[in-house]
Amino acid sequence: MTPERIQRLTRVLDKRQNDLTVVLENVYDPHNISAVMRTADAVGIQEISVLNTRIGPHKKWGAKSSSSAAKWLTVKQYSDPGSCFADLRRNYDLILTTHLSTEAVSLYDIDFTKSIALVFGNEHDGVSEEIRNMADGNFIIPQVGIIRSLNISVA
């Protein structure tokens, strides 16, 4: 590895946000997961958790969507919500799920000085009630259009 490559990797690692993570619950399409990985890498999130209670663990991500981001991230896969949340509780102060409710806070009002896990649901049903009940609260991504939801790959 060249000295320039080592220097670039060191710079990137120094800017990683180890106090912010993303959790994806039952996301069916591996290309959507890969798109989230690419975004996470771009904004400096190091760790992603993939929780699958309805489908088996993903063996392969959509390579074109992630642009190989998966190899630079720590990706944890879970099949049990309890195990996933036990790990999240050990490492993060606050766990919030995306869910449109009267109690949901705006993404812009979240105190990101705390360590936070943001949970996103699947393409069809969003975050399950079971996972919402395990979390500390809900948040929304404010929108001004008619459609009140975003695809997981862009949220």
Please describe what each predicted stretch is.
Residues 1-154:
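Post-transcriptional modification and biogenesis factors for structured RNAs
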